Amino acid sequence: MTNIRKTHPLLKIVNHSLIDLPAPSNISAWWNFGSLLGLCLMIQILTGLFLAMHYTSDTLTAFSSVTHICRDVNYGWLIRYLHANGASMFFICLYMHVGRGIYYGSYTYLETWNIGIILLFAVMATAFMGYVLPWGQMSFWGATVITNLLSASPYIGTTLVEWIWGGFSVDKATLTRFFAFHFILPFIIAALVMVHLLFLHETGSNNPSGIPSDSDKIPFHPYYTIKDALGFLVLILLLLLLVLFSPDLLGDPDNYTPANPLNTPPHIKPEWYFLFAYAILRSIPNKLGGVLALVMSILVLAIIPLLHMSKQRSMMFRPISQVLFWILVADLLTLTWIGGQPVEHPFITIGQVASILYFSIILIFMPLASLIENKILKW
């Protein structure tokens, strides 16, 4: 008799995705981040569900309800900080996952890559709306500043912003709809993840060498299930260290002050994981230009497959591209630092140089390096 996991209509899908899936024998720890992102999403949905049971999306009570969760609900403080810091872990894994894709040329799987970009946008939108919900100072002013960027759209800008606000400023209507969207989006993300995996399993995983691994496959279970389990342990350990020892390390103290439309905080800045994009936005003195640069900072990922000039898929054996890649990583860290600094000399200049360098590396230097490396192959 054939094993039920191979015949049952539902178990068959699980079997082909997680058990009998043929996987390359040489994928490194950089391939762990996909499953870690799945774990992060599950943690966020679960903790978010329990938070939603006690949260009220009303301007008068939102801040108090979050305080109530932390003080009066059993382990409410744990759920709240797991959710807040879980978002940070989510973005760390996201950026590592995207970085791995760029380094090892995984972007040549076009459908998987493009769904991944849509997922990145969806997660960023969810995180932004989630940050508004506690209704602290940074929640309110962050929402005001970021939604206001849409007013840069020609002709329809102002109408568009007021339509999103549900009024003439960020108020009760805005908070209520942000809560609704923040609740529904993770489930849309989960559905997109299924599509992401569907496309990935059409081609199979890439591997560090970038060479097709059809001749040497191993079953996903037990080899990569145990490897993923180790990744889960490390992620949970790091998350708990953060939550139990310094839960407010990555947050903004201003968000412990209830939202006040009459008092603007001295430095309006988003959570750390958006600072690189925020720095790019601020480095352009024109509003529309800044918004376009902000969108392009992520959308540029969609252009990367078109700029792949190399005869090799992975950067494993391409030293010039490797150097450029790590300069890009350093540049993103620089942008993250600049995004958290006030708009004054010398930070303005550093931000502008880092922004130009970011786009130059991706759009100009990396394709050029690939062409040079192609020439070197013939020497």
From Swiss-Prot:
Lineage, uppermost ranks: Eukaryota, Metazoa, Chordata, Craniata, Vertebrata
Functional description taken from the UniProt entry: Component of the ubiquinol-cytochrome c reductase complex (complex III or cytochrome b-c1 complex) that is part of the mitochondrial respiratory chain. The b-c1 complex mediates electron transfer from ubiquinol to cytochrome c. Contributes to the generation of a proton gradient across the mitochondrial membrane that is then used for ATP synthesis.
Record has Kinase as a keyword: no
Note: Heme 1 (or BL or b562) is low-potential and absorbs at about 562 nm, and heme 2 (or BH or b566) is high-potential and absorbs at about 566 nm.
Binding-site list for heme b b562: H83, H182
Domain of life: Eukaryota
UniProt: heme b b566 binding residues: H97, H196
GO molecular function: metal ion binding; ubiquinol-cytochrome-c reductase activity
Keyword match Membrane: yes
Membrane topology, as annotated: Multi-pass membrane protein
Gene: MT-CYB
Family: Belongs to the cytochrome b family.
Protein name, UniProt field: Cytochrome b
